[in-house]
C-alpha cells in the first residue's frame, strides 16, 4: 500500500509538461484517451462537493492563472520556470488564461506559487 501512496504523491506533484507527456504515453502505448478519465474526476469531485466541511478542510488546490497583468514577459518566464515548460509553451499557456498552472498542489505549495506569480504581476486564483 505504501507504494501506491508514493505513486499518488508523485502523480499529484507532476508539472504541466509531465502531465502532457504522461497523457501522450497513455494514449500511444496503452490506447487510453485522457478525456476518458475526465468524467471519473468530475464524478468524484461532485460527490465531495455537497459536504461543506470537506470544502473548508481542503488541503490541495488548483493554481489558476486568471491573467498575466501588465508584466506579461515576467509572468511567462516565471511560468516557464515553475512548470518546466518550454518558452513557447509557457507563453501559449499565459496567452490562453484563465488556465491552471498546477493542479492538486498541496496548500503550502499552492500559496507559494500564487504569491510568486502575483509578485510577477499576474492575477491568480486558488480553487
Swiss-Prot record:
SUPFAM superfamilies: ClpS-like (SSF54736), Ribosomal protein L7/12, oligomerisation (N-terminal) domain (SSF48300). One of its GO terms (cellular component) is cytosolic large ribosomal subunit. Homodimer. Part of the ribosomal stalk of the 50S ribosomal subunit. Forms a multimeric L10(L12)X complex, where L10 forms an elongated spine to which 2 to 4 L12 dimers bind in a sequential fashion. Binds GTP-bound translation factors. GO terms for molecular function: mRNA binding; structural constituent of ribosome. It comes from Amoebophilus asiaticus (strain 5a2). InterPro entries: Ribosomal_bL12, Ribosomal_bL12_C, Ribosomal_bL12_C/ClpS-like, Ribosomal_bL12_oligo, Ribosomal_bL12_oligo_N_sf. GO terms for biological process: translation. This is Large ribosomal subunit protein bL12. Pfam families: Ribosomal_L12, Ribosomal_L12_N. Transmembrane segments: none annotated. Belongs to the bacterial ribosomal protein bL12 family. Forms part of the ribosomal stalk which helps the ribosome interact with GTP-bound translation factors. Is thus essential for accurate translation. Keywords: Ribonucleoprotein, Ribosomal protein. Residues 98-127 are annotated as: Disordered.
Amino acid at each position: 500500500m505504501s507504494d501506491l501512496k508514493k505513486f499518488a504523491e508523485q502523480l499529484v506533484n507532476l508539472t504541466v509538461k509531465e502531465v502532457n507527456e504522461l497523457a501522450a504515453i497513455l494514449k500511444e502505448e496503452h490506447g487510453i484517451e485522457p478525456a476518458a478519465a475526465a468524467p471519473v474526476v468530475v464524478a468524484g469531485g461532485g460527490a465531495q462537493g455537497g459536504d461543506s466541511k470537506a470544502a473548508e478542510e481542503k488541503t490541495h488546490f488548483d493554481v489558476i492563472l486568471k491573467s498575466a497583468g501588465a508584466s506579461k514577459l515576467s509572468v511567462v518566464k516565471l511560468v516557464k520556470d515553475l512548470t518546466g515548460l518550454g518558452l513557447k509553451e509557457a507563453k501559449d499557456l499565459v496567452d490562453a488564461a484563465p488556465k491552471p498552472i498546477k493542479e492538486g498542489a498541496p496548500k503550502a505549495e499552492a500559496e507559494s506559487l500564487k504569491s510568486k506569480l502575483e509578485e510577477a504581476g499576474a492575477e491568480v486564483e486558488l480553487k
